[in-house]
Amino acid sequence: MIDAGGCHYTTMSNHSARRIAGTLGFAGVLFGAFGAHILRQLLQKSGTTEIWQTGVLYNLVHAVALLALSGWKPVPSRAFNLILGGVIIFSGSLYLLALTNVRWLGAVTPIGGLGMLSGWLVLVLSKREET
């Protein structure tokens, strides 16, 4: 189903969307704890603590956003998927960059940022009617 603003609403169930958002939130807390405790010395030694923390921040913020979208009926799947893919690429590339210090990974990060921005823009431009 597509609304007047072109926002896709497909068969993604609210339950599936909640599980995905919950998994992303779980991962954010897990990575935050790993960075603060288990990886602390490694990240400090390599000077990549801030990079790791940025990945955790965007991971957690967008997990909450996806959790909110999971309550919409129907779930706006295009926006949901763009934000999800974006945060996986954005935060994932930052986690890998912080661990490996492989600098070309920094060039991948903006692709994830564009995915997240695109998802938010789809929401802003959609003409979803309040029910």
Q: In which residue ranges do the predicted regions lie?
A:
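Polytopic transmembrane helical bundles with strong interfacial aromatic enrichment
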Residues: 8-131
